[in-house]
Amino acid sequence: KSVTTLKDEEIGFLKGTMKEKMEPFMYSFMHNFEKVIGKYNVELLRANNMIEEMPIAYMRGINIDNSITIIDEAQNISIDNIRTIMTRLGENSKMIFLGDENQIDMKKKGESSLNFIINKFKDFDEVGTVVLGEDDVVRNPLIKKIEQIFRESKM
């Protein structure tokens, strides 16, 4: 998951283990993951060390084999960093990139990797893309109206 914070809202250095440091950044993903597969199943996967959380900075030099890697908030990962992530793909593995092009928090929006990877890899047989639209919003019906206001305001 990208550890990009919202518009200059730095939180400073965090104490603790890598897992403890990653926890605030992983909270939203894990919360939603629990909704999908259930809290018990997430706890079971954690207990069996089948879930690993890793900052991009620690990925260099590793191969990710026999795994499904989920990269959340991909719109806030730079193209250089997405390259680091993608080139870790090992045997019998898949990568899933999640993101919203309307929620880019990077200072230079053109450096976001989400549209880059969608456009550059769309013709690869090994790559699939799912784009969710306004009709796919399930969080709250009001969200559709909120998104429409922001789209019309070009924010």
What are these regions (language model features)?
Residues 1-155:
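Conserved helicase motor core of SF1/SF2 NTP-dependent helicases
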